[in-house]
């Protein structure tokens, strides 16, 4: 039936509410989600045997800065293409722009 919208069963539309989204939680330091064991595993993969306790906070700070710059460039590519979804190619091009070529994801 025309004019019924996307409701499915029709009706007058009383009580219809848009899609419910998750409520915003108070922003906390999400960088702390990069846990100490995760940093240890990355260091082990790089061949590190012992890690100073000062390394963890410094690693989080460096990682946060790196990700901010890559995400900023990726979003710039996405906006230029008039899209709202960041694609893998946007990230590949952002990394390439920063001199860190990544293979295996197209482009």
UniProtKB/Swiss-Prot annotation:
Molecular function terms, GO-annotated: DNA binding; protein heterodimerization activity; structural constituent of chromatin
List the subcellular locations: Nucleus; Chromosome
Please state the protein's primary subcellular location. Answer: nucleus
DNA-binding region in chain numbering: 17-21
| The keyword Nucleus appears for this protein | yes
Which spans does this entry mark as compositional bias, Gly residues? 1-16
Q: Report keywords, A-Z.
A: Chromosome, DNA-binding, Nucleosome core, Nucleus
Q: Does the keyword Nucleus apply?
A: yes
Q: Which residues cross the membrane?
A: none
A GO CC term assigned to this protein in UniProt: nucleosome
Disordered: region residues: 1-23
The record, for PANTHER family, names: HISTONE H4
Protein's job: Core component of nucleosome. Nucleosomes wrap and compact DNA into chromatin, limiting DNA accessibility to the cellular machineries which require DNA as a template. Histones thereby play a central role in transcription regulation, DNA repair, DNA replication and chromosomal stability. DNA accessibility is regulated via a complex set of post-translational modifications of histones, also called histone code, and nucleosome remodeling.
- Family stated for the protein in its record: Belongs to the histone H4 family.
Fill in the subunit field for this protein: The nucleosome is a histone octamer containing two molecules each of H2A, H2B, H3 and H4 assembled in one H3-H4 heterotetramer and two H2A-H2B heterodimers. The octamer wraps approximately 147 bp of DNA.
User: How is this protein named in the record?
Assistant: Histone H4
Q: Which organism encodes this protein?
A: Euplotes crassus
